[in-house]
């Protein structure tokens, strides 16, 4: 019996390579011991042509995220995984599974594409306080009919370049020039410069900059969400990968038990023929064989399903044939420190950070709503230079700057809201929402601490379960070896040996299950803490 080594100790028989032809694809159960080295290249998974295709798509995505207007003339065209090229089974390590998911998982690709739109939302918010340009133009033809006199046709053309800008204090500056050109080539442009400044309602950076600050917070949170989204997918890949290992071990365990049950049945048949056992002495064993056959069938179906789930989670072709290791490595069993984990979660947990950002946005909305209750007092000034019509023949641009035709005006506008329920409603809603989100933030903080506490308690319990499972395997192995010696001495039956061997197989299956449960709980904790990418030494290619 080939034994698998981990931490210098024999743990369980290595699972032989199992190949199953699945309706929608093919996979192989756990093979030899040990995991594929994480440094193994992905070249055997990705052809040179596919590598080139990936590189070009990555470059397009990078350009689109850095400059979203790249999408006006181009497509990103992220590639999906190619069809399986290898008919032979390929060994897949956990690190390889994660790296392939980073390239082909559709949820990760969608999150990367979302960054294009998200970056442009920030650009839109910044554009509010940038210089705005526009060019307007119009042409008109008027025809008049005068009874007894005749007809008259007049044509007019107007081209108006416009520039305006809004500052963070609420000041609005505008500049436009009306260019009038008629049929007599009488060009007489008019330049208008205007300025408006609210003094109460709409005044101040806190009011006018609120949307921009919200957009900046949203952009920062979008980066965090991208990391969290990738972390969630990686955790799913890890879970699916370990589930396949567990289902493969379960299948192999059920097959071994069925094999041993058939051996016992054959031995009993010989004893019945020799008169050493009653003719009905094999009925119970026949029932055991049928029960185990059913369990093997169920285990085979679970294994096939787990294989397809892993391929789908990674984003690979369903017809890909792969094998995974028969065991997982735990290394040193550790329980994370509770206080350190809570501190890290409060700094990096995406949902909690999103709630804090929402609270900040509510505070800004409350400030804006309070400002909206004030009187609307606006001062403005306007300077017009030039002439609409030319009366002395000195037309052209000189009419703008010669100082002869300047009109200056100033104004103040006051609007006093009286029983304006809409404005009052805005303030009421803002205060209620702010109060609710304050309570929600406190509740979410407590819920996060509770979740971290429960998770670490589970990790501690699973660590003890794993250590107990190791001892159980050791004792079951000793019991099995003892029964073998008894059988050789003639004081133990084959049935006794089979029973102790089944106990050993069950203990080994329990050990694998305990290890995977412990590791999965650690992976889930890393996901909640926001440290999954750091743990796997992954740096996002785009969007940060």
Feature roles, as predicted:
Residues 223-344, 458, 462-465, 503-505, ...:
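Periplasmic alpha-helical coiled-coil/stalk elements that build and connect Gram-negative outer-membrane
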Residues 156-158, 190, 239, 284, ...:
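Transmembrane beta-barrel architecture of outer-membrane proteins
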Residues 83-89, 136-197, 325-335, 367, ...:
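Small/polar, glycine/serine/threonine/aspartate-rich low-complexity segments that form flexible
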Residues 74-100:
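Regulatory alphaC helix of protein kinase catalytic domains
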Residues 58-61, 117-120, 125-127, 247, ...:
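Short segments within alpha-helical structural elements
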Residues 101-102, 164, 277, 281-282, ...:
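Amphipathic alpha-helical coiled-coil scaffold segments and their short linker/junction regions
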Residues 7, 26-63, 71, 80-86, ...:
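Acidic, low-complexity, intrinsically disordered peripheral segments
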Residues 109-113, 126, 168-188, 199-224, ...:
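Sec/SRP-type N-terminal targeting helices
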């Amino acid at each position: 019996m080939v034994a698998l080594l981990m931490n210098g100790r024999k743990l369980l028989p290595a699972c032989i390579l199992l190949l199953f032809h699945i309706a929608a694809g093919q996979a192989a159960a756990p093979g030899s011991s040990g995991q594929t080295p994480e440094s193994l290249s992905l070249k055997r998974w990705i052809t040179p042509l596919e590598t080139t295709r990936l590189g070009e798509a990555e470059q397009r995505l990078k350009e689109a995220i850095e400059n979203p207007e790249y999408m006006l003339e181009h497509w990103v065209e992220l590639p999906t995984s190619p069809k399986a090229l290898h008919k032979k089974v390929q060994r897949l390590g956990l690190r390889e599974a994660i790296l392939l998911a980073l390239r082909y998982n559709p949820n990760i690709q969608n999150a990367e594409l979302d960054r294009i739109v998200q970056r442009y939302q920030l650009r839109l918010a910044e554009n509010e306080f940038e210089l705005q340009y526009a060019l307007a133009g119009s042409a008109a033809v008027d025809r008049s009919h005068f009874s007894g006199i005749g007809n008259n046709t007049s044509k007019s053309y107007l081209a108006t370049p416009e520039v305006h800008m809004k500052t963070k204090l609420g000041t609005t500056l505008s500049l436009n020039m009306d260019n009038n050109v008629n049929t007599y080539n009488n060009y007489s442009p008019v330049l208008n410069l205007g300025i408006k400044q609210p003094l109460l309602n709409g005044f101040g950076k806190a009011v006018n900059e609120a949307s921009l600050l919200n957009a900046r917070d949203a952009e920062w949170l979008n980066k965090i969400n991208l990391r969290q989204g990738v972390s969630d997918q990686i955790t799913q890949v890890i879970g699916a990968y370990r589930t396949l290992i567990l289902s493969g071990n379960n299948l192999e365990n059920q097959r071994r038990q069925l094999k041993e049950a058939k051996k016992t049945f054959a031995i009993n048949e010989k004893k019945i023929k020799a008169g050493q056992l009653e003719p009905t002495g094999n009925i119970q064993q026949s029932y055991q064989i049928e029960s185990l056959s059913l369990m093997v069938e169920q285990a085979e179906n679970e294994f096939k399903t787990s294989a397809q789930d892993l391929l789908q989670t990674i984003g690979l072709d369903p017809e890909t044939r792969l094998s995974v290791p028969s065991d997982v490595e735990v290394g040193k069993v550790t329980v994370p420190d509770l206080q350190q984990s809570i501190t890290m979660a409060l700094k990096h947990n995406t949902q909690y950070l999103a709630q804090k950002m929402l609270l900040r946005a509510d505070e800004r909305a409350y400030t804006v709503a309070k400002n909206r209750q004030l009187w609307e007092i606006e001062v403005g000034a306007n300077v017009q230079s030039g002439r609409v019509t030319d009366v002395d023949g000195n037309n052209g641009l000189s009419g703008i700057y010669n100082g002869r035709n300047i009109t200056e005006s100033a104004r103040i506008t006051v609007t006093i809201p009286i029983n304006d329920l809409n404005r009052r409603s805005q303030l009421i809603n803002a205060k209620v929402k702010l109060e609710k989100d304050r309570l929600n933030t406190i509740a979410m903080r407590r819920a996060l601490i509770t979740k971290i506490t429960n998770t670490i308690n589970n990790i501690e319990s699973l660590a003890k379960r794993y250590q107990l499972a190791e001892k159980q395997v050791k004792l079951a192995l000793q019991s099995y070896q003892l029964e073998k010696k008894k059988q050789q001495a003639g004081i133990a039956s084959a049935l006794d040996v089979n029973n102790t061997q089944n106990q050993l197989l069950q203990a080994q299956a329990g050990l694998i299950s305990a290890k995977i449960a412990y590791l999965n709980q650690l992976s889930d904790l890393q996901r909640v803490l926001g440290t999954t990418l750091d743990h796997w030494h992954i740096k996002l290619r785009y969007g940060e």
